[in-house]
Amino acid sequence: MFGKVEEKLNNVLKTEGALYFILIDPDEKNCLEIAEKVKDYADAIILGGSIGITNLDETTKQIKEIIGDIPIILFPGNVDGLTPYADAVFFMSFMNSNNTYWTTTAPTLGAITVKKYNLEPISMAYLGIEPIKRTAVGFVGEVNEIPQRKPEIAGMYCLSAKYFGMRWAYLEAGSGAELPVSNEIIGISKKLSGINIIVGGGIRTPETAYQKVLSGADAIVTGTLIEDNPDAVKEMRNAIKKAGIDKL
């Protein structure tokens, strides 16, 4: 049984072949400005960060007023990254963290708040891919990063996630990563698991996004892109949607 947000995302996948998620850090001073710029291009807004969260309730309400019916999915960096004003939450395990806090304890502590806030949980495996160790999420999450040259390891993690009952896997190279997740990792992860594959980190050009979708990605995440080139979001969406149709 899917919730409303996940059902909506799956319906877009069936008709358009790929999703475009835009990550907004609620602690960024210009987060409302970013929301205004991207509202016409995102299939969902992913809201969260890997360091501190301040004034999340008010920021989420303000972003919701700007983006209208576009779902806000929380991407919590810790148990304080939850708010009742979002539509859903990626209920995730950082599967290749060396610290059990991130694999099981944090989601366990957050579960009762997810229920209290009536947030739709979207079960997801979160996997740190090389070079994530050199990014904030890799440092905070104490990640045992998956080497780019060993795509079968990522594939096995995704298959494990499927057997645990997770429906999504996020292959993350880290915000601002110098290299994105390889096409080989994406391809084998999708082929082995069959679950929805999200790819983020280091995707800076429409051409790169196009190749990631053709390789098997179901959703592409960009975040810092809008800060570097505000006009790139439309081009990115067009490339993702073209690849999605070409893949169908």
From Swiss-Prot:
Cofactor: Mg(2+)
A single Gene Ontology CC term: cytoplasm
Binding-site residues for Mg(2+), renumbered to this chain: 25, 50
Catalysis performed (reactions): sn-glycerol 1-phosphate + (2E,6E,10E)-geranylgeranyl diphosphate = sn-3-O-(geranylgeranyl)glycerol 1-phosphate + diphosphate
Residues binding sn-glycerol 1-phosphate, per UniProt: 170-176, 201-202, 223-224
Family: Belongs to the GGGP/HepGP synthase family. Group II subfamily.
Record's protein name: Geranylgeranylglyceryl phosphate synthase
Source lineage: Archaea, Methanobacteriati, Methanobacteriota, Methanomada group, Methanococci
